[in-house]
Amino acid sequence: MSNVRSDKPFVLAGRTFESRLLVGTGKYIDMEQTRLAIEASGAEIVTVAVRRTNLGQNPGEPNLLDVLPPDRYTILPNTAGCFDATEAVRTCRLSRELLDGRNLVKLEVLADQKTLFPNVIETLKAAEILVKDGFDVMVYTSDDPIIARQLAEIGCIAIMPLAGLIGSGLGICNPYNLQIILEETKVPVLVDAGVGTASDATIAMELGCEAVLMNSAIAHAQQPVMMAEAMKHAVIAGRLAYLAGRMPRKLYASASSPLDGLIK
């Protein structure tokens, strides 16, 4: 029984969350669909792109916070659309002003428009500045275990390696690197990007990830609200399967019922 896993709460920046599904707000047809899908997902943490979303910086325009009130959801501002450390740091500081001094941010610094791979050099620079500036940094990164370790050593509170390209729906492309990151990293690891359907989310959780973040997999589904509910259950199922521990893989069959004592 020494290998039995015990459940631990999902804690970020000193706060405990029940849901291990984090969701984005982009790509929906309107704010009402956004609201309905996020409600169906059961998510408590909702990430928003500060440079693309009105959080109050544009008076007179629809404000996402009217649909997703901060007293109900933890708003996680992100730096989507930033391609260097300077832009990312500036965006995080703007988000802190807009959200009444809240320090929780999702850092992402992209390398190019085509792949949206993270620029890990600029990400490391930005992370170091933001941590020193008092931010609680959750960081989007590659599935390189060494970079993940360096980001954790800088002081990031969560490492968020991609499972596949952003918006690709390719699923968990490199589970082996994710396993190394999970073994070597002492802070929460969340899969970010690449999830396409419920089974992808379950696999990420079965590997041992603390949580999964997604947007396109829900927003681009034929029925986003229904997919949001599917993802809610997929994450729960994956977490339970991880805690339960899967059976060993075997090359040959093993009968469910013993052959001894068969009726003759």
UniProtKB/Swiss-Prot annotation:
Pathway linked to the protein: Cofactor biosynthesis; thiamine diphosphate biosynthesis
Enzyme class: transferase
EC number: 2.8.1.10
GO terms for biological process, alphabetical: thiamine diphosphate biosynthetic process
Active site as annotated: K106 (schiff-base intermediate with dxp)
Subcellular localization, as worded in the UniProt entry: Cytoplasm
Family per similarity comment: Belongs to the ThiG family.
Complexes and interactors: Homotetramer. Forms heterodimers with either ThiH or ThiS.
UniProt name for this protein: Thiazole synthase
